[in-house]
């Protein structure tokens, strides 16, 4: 569940009790790693203290639930591990809501570990943009772990998730720049993830339509804005986007 457990699985067909020994070793390793993770998590980062006990209870509970449900190596499903709504798929406009807080609360490494997944599906995101006639990478809304766009009458026309990865990358970078313990990671970090910024921004630029008469760039139909309540063919320059 915690995606922090690294266990060495053992296989020994020559011993009758190999499976039992393997299970015991694996459980011991899992137990130790889980203990270490939670100890380090609650002993580091930032915290909010307030005399209101109910507020404190909610802060602590929220930090626990968000880490258990959302801090994996791939973005979480819409409702985490709790239930199976929205077909159990990851929704990239929700990744920001689920995990961006980790950078602000002193746990940037827990947010960063999901960025490799974006790199792994970058080819699919580029194919998605190309299918729509654009350059760069178009991140899907409802997505499989392989980066495939899941069937939906709404998801393909949503765009407000596009800048989220850039924003999250910047939030983690700010943490590294402002903390002497992390600062040595900055150059490696920028070199590794710049491709995500470049491809994401290229799509966002190409998506806009230039109007010669008004000398403006516009978001033209069809597009479904964040409210998901307006006809895509009648929507132009939605305010939030």
What are these regions (language model features)?
Residues 52-60, 75-76, 89-93, 105-112, ...:
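Conserved structured core elements
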Residues 43-46, 65, 97-110, 164-182, ...:
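Well-ordered alpha-helical scaffold segments within catalytic/enzyme domains
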Residues 77-89, 134-190, 205-241:
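The feature captures the catalytic groove of carbohydrate-active enzymes
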Residues 11-15, 114-116, 181-194, 209:
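Composition- and surface-driven signal marking solvent-exposed, interaction-prone regions
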Residues 8, 67, 103, 202, ...:
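Residue-level marker of positions within ordered structural domains that often coincide
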Residues 59, 92-137:
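Carboxylate/His-rich catalytic cores and anion/metal-binding grooves
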Residues 64-73, 110, 114-130, 196-212:
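Long, well-ordered core segments of solenoidal/helical folds
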Residues 1-88, 108, 118-124:
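Acidic/polar, glycine-enriched structural segments that form the non-catalytic walls/loops
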């Amino acid at each position: 569940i915690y995606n922090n457990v690294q266990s060495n699985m053992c296989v020994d067909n020559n011993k009758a009790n190999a499976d039992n020994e393997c299970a015991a070793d694996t459980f011991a390793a899992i137990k130790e790693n889980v203990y270490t993770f939670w100890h380090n998590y609650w002993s580091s980062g930032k915290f909010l203290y307030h005399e209101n006990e109910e507020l404190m209870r909610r802060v602590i509970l929220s930090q626990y639930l968000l880490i258990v449900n959302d801090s994996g190596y791939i973005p979480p499903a819409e409702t985490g591990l709790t239930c199976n709504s929205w077909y159990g798929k990851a929704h990239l406009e929700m990744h920001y809501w689920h995990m961006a807080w980790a950078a602000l609360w002193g746990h940037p490494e827990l947010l960063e570990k999901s960025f490799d997944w974006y790199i792994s599906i970058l080819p699919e995101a580029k194919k998605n943009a190309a299918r729509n006639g654009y350059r760069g990478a178009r991140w899907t809304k409802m997505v499989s772990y392989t980066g495939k766009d899941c069937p939906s009458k709404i998801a393909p026309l949503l765009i407000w998730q596009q800048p989220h990865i850039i924003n999250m990358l910047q939030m983690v970078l700010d943490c590294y720049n402002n903390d002497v313990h992390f600062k040595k990671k900055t150059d490696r970090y920028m070199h590794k993830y710049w491709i995500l910024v470049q491809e994401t921004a290229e799509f966002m630029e190409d998506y806009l339509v230039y109007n010669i008469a008004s000398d403006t760039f516009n978001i033209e139909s069809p597009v479904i804005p964040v409210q998901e309540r307006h006809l895509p063919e009648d929507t132009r320059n939605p305010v939030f986007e």
